Amino acid sequence: MSKDVKPTRKNLMAIEDRIELSERGHDTLEKKRDGLIMEFMDILDQAQDVRSDLDENYERAQRNINMARAMEGDVAVRGAAAALKEHPEITTQSKNIMGVVVPQIESTKVKKSLDQRGYGLVGTSARIDEAADAYEELLETIILAAEVETAMKKMLDEIEKTKRRVNALEFKLLPELHEAQEYIEQKLEEQEREEIFRMKKIKAKKEEEEEENPVADTESAAEAAVTEAGQ
């Protein structure tokens, strides 16, 4: 890049402005990256808790449904499930975390009371109720896990994108700009030294000519004086 820049003071000022702007942008992106990482770590902690809950709730739901089938039979369990009239409803909204839009999943009608499940209290046992409770809680955990996992992925993508931009400024653009700045400054200094050397050379030559022709200089001065007196 440095060899492609014309070494002028105008270009030097333009590059210095670009360096200042790039350094400010680099600092801003670094702060954003660090903030995103902190937010990501919070979400990661939450995700680990949710995964643990998901495993526990899944095992409990499987254990309870197996117990209900063993005690009541598949027909009774399927009949209780088929009696369900109100199915869970899920709505999605969004929230902003440091410029990253992540989903916020809201669920309703997941947890139900005994009379909301549709099957009669007579003819069913507590085993079926326990299985229903376990699966309702499992579904709520799955919904929360989907929200957290999606947010974590979006945050991670934004962190990687921000890191690439920081690295591009730090390891490519800014070094190229500093190299161009040094190149122009060096060339301008060379031009200044050459100009000083040229002026000194002209001055020395003039002084040398004056020393070689002192009589001519005296005669010229005398002629000038006579001319002035005659006027």
Swiss-Prot record:
Q: Which GO terms describe its cellular component?
A: plasma membrane
Task: Tell whether Glycoprotein is among the UniProt keywords.
Answer: no
Q: Where is this region: Disordered?
A: 204-231
A Pfam family name for this chain?
Answer: ATP-synt_D
**Topology versus the membrane, per the UniProt entry?**
Peripheral membrane protein
Where is this chain compositionally biased, Low complexity type? 215-231
Instruction: State the Gene3D superfamilies in the record.
Output: 1.10.287.3240
Record-level GO BP terms? proton motive force-driven plasma membrane ATP synthesis
Which keywords does this chain's UniProt record carry?
Answer: ATP synthesis, Cell membrane, Hydrogen ion transport, Ion transport, Membrane, Transport
- Compartment annotation: Cell membrane
Could you state a single Gene Ontology molecular function term? Answer: ATP binding
What is its biological role? Component of the A-type ATP synthase that produces ATP from ADP in the presence of a proton gradient across the membrane.
HAMAP family given for it? ATP_synth_D_arch (MF_00271)
Assembly and oligomerization: Has multiple subunits with at least A(3), B(3), C, D, E, F, H, I and proteolipid K(x).
Q: Which family does it belong to?
A: Belongs to the V-ATPase D subunit family.
Protein name as it appears in the record = A-type ATP synthase subunit D
Q: Which organism is it from?
A: Natronomonas pharaonis (strain ATCC 35678 / DSM 2160 / CIP 103997 / JCM 8858 / NBRC 14720 / NCIMB 2260 / Gabara) (Halobacterium pharaonis)
